[in-house]
Structures are given as C-alpha cells and as structure tokens.
Amino acid sequence: MILTFARSLYTQGQYNGKIREYFYYVSHNGFLFLDDSRMKNFTAAYKDIQFLNFFYRKIKENKTGRYEDTFPWVSLCGIERNFLRCDDTPLVYTELDSTEKELRIGQSTIYHSFQPSSLSMNSSGRVYHKCPIGGKALVADKLTDKLYRRFRFDDDGVPVGFQCGEQIIELKK
C-alpha cells in the first residue's frame, strides 16, 4: 500500500523547476533499485560500480522539503535529486573483506572500517554496525549468517561479545 501511494506521488525523471528527480529503493540485502520497478531482485538491481560509488558517497538526510516522509534520504548529483527510501537503513554492509578490517557497502567498491565493538543485534536478530550515514547500517543477512557463530550471548540470549581471533570483543549496549 505504501509503495502504491509513493508511486502516485512522482514520475521518474520529473522536473521540479530545473532539477530532475529520480526515486530509488535500497533492499535489506543492499541492492539498489528504481523505486517503481516491479521486480526487486538481483537481475533488476543496479550493478554499475561507478554509479553506485557516486550514489552512495552522496547520500544524506533528505532536508529538501520534498518527499521527506516517503523518501527520508537523498543523493544529490549536480542538478539531479535522487530520492531514496530503504527497507531498513540507507547503507547496507554486504561483505567483510578478507583481512576482516573493512565492510563493503552494497554492491559498490566503497568500504568502511570494521569495528567489531560497534556491532549490535536487535530483538528480531538483525545485525547493525556503526556507520557515518544514519548512525548505523544494516549488516545483510548473508554476511550476518557468516558472522553469527562468532557472537557470544548471555543467558538471556542477548549478544554481549564478538570473537576476533582469540579475543572476545565486548559489544556496546
């Protein structure tokens, strides 16, 4: 219902004065789609690395006065506004590099520093990591599955630590 409502608010590529506007969606798996695409699966996701890198580097909170409730994020590109809504967070970490020092954003080649102590898990089991945009980024399910065995839990099932090599890193509450 919300998607149908959002679609009726805009037309892809519409002009607002001299500013062209596009509308995007980020899934919980870190894939970027045109918001109004019917099929939101791997084949429909953006794969152009240069575009993804540019798009993700420019994301900020939407304070444009347009679509702020429906599209809380925006990626500005010259005279274009790329409005963004997301399943959870605007950035999603999809991969931990082989050195375990950096997390990859979506399908881009942008990495942020991995800080195990900043991991957190909500009551539904979703895992988050500190992020400069929005304060935290979702860790994609596929990566969470790989990391899950390294979490340490208290008697109530709350994650309290994360194993890095021989060391257990205490998680912040």
Swiss-Prot record:
Family that this chain belongs to: Belongs to the UPF0598 family.
InterPro entries, per database record: DUF4505
Protein name: UPF0598 protein F59C6.12
Organism: Caenorhabditis elegans
